[in-house]
Amino acid sequence: MTRSRSRALRVASALAAVALVAAGCDGSGFVPGTDGGAGDDETAAAAAPDAVVTANVKDEAADVSVDKVVRVRAEKGTLTSVVLRSKAGRVEGEIRGDGARWVSSAGLEPGTRYRVRAVARNAEGKEVQRVSTFTTQALSLEQQTYASIAPLQGETVGVGMPVVVNFDLPVTDQASFEKHMTVTSTPAQAGSWFWVSSREAHWRPQSYWQAGTKVSVDVAVNGVSAGAGIYGQEDRKVDFEIGAAHVYKVNARTHQMKVFENGRLLRTLPITTGKEGFTTRSGVKVIMEKYAQKRMNSETVGIARGSAEAYDIDDVKWAMRITSSGEFIHAAPWSVGSQGRANVSHGCTGMSIDNAAWLYSMTRRGDVVEYVGTDRAMEPGNGWGDWNVSWPDYVAGSALA
C-alpha cells in the first residue's frame, strides 16, 4: 500500500466514525449500546401535589356564633396538627377520618379572637401550613344562661338525691342542651333526665342509688344554643358520692317513723303529722335542707297572722325540709303528749327534741322519707318529688325521648 493510499483510508475511517456518532442524535432516539427504551426523565413519577387545607370559618371573619363547630379539612393530604386557641387557651377538638378532617368539640367564648393553625402533609411528606383568625360575637349576660347544680362538689348525699340543674335564664331548645348534659356513675346505674320546667332539669336513676356510688355530672353547655338568642354561659362539672342508704318510713295512721340504714331497722320513733285541714302529703319525699334552728312563721304557708291557727316560733330545733311548700321534720316539744297517738301539726312531722337531734345527726340531703296513711298525695313538683313520677313518665320527660 502506498503512503497516499494509507492516508485516504484513515480519513475515510474517521468520517465513518463521525457519521455513527451523528446517527446517535437523530429523531429515532436510538443510542448505540442501549436497548432503545425511554430516558430517565420519562420514567420518573410526577411530583405529588401539595396538600390543600381549608376551614369552614373564613380568615378574619367577625361575629362568628359561639355555637359554631369549627371544621378543618385536608385535600390531597392528611392533617398532622390543628390548634384552635385564644389567649385563654386551646379549644379541644380531634382529627377524624384518617386525617382528612378536624372538628372542634368545645364551645367558643363570646367576644373572643381565635387563631387556627393547621398543618397537613402530602403523599411525599411535604408539609403545608394554614393560619387564620376569627372573632366571635359579643354576648351580654342577658344572652347567657348559667347552670347551678345540686349536689355540691364533693358532697355526700342520700340514696334518693336527684341531680338538680337550675338555669338562670330559660332554655327553650332543651334537646340541644340535654345532648351536652351527662351523668355517669360507678357502679353504673341507668337513669334519665326530666325537665321540670324551662329553667330546671333533674336526673335520677331508675331505682334509689346504691350506697357508695360515685357520681359525675358534666353540664357541657358553654356556647350551646338554648334557643331564643340565649347561649350556655360556661361548662359545669360536679362530682359527689352516695352515702349509707337512709330510708325513713312514716305512717300517719300509726303515728310512727321507722328509721332504716342499709336495710336494717335502727329505731322506731313516735311522731305526729298534719291534723285535719293541714293533712301531710303521702308519697316519697327527699331531705332538701337542714337547719339546727329555724324560725317558722305560719304566714309563709298561707295561714294569716291573727288567725286561730297562726304561729311564729323563732327557734324550732333540728328542722329538715322535705317539700318546697313548707313541710319539715323537726323537734316539736309542745306536742310530745300527742306523738305516737294523734296528728296535731300544721303538716310538719314533729318529734321529741332528743329524737329529732338523733335523726338530724345522721341525716344527709337526699335521704328518703316515705309517707303513707293520708289521702293527700305528694305533688312531683313540690320540692324534689322525682320518686313520685313513674319510670315511664320520667323517661318521657326527657327532651330526647
Give the positions of each predicted feature:
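Gly/Pro-biased beta-strand-loop elements
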Residues: 229-337
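Acidic, low-complexity Ser/Thr/Gly/Pro-rich repeat segments typical of extracellular/periplasmic
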Residues: 2-244, 271
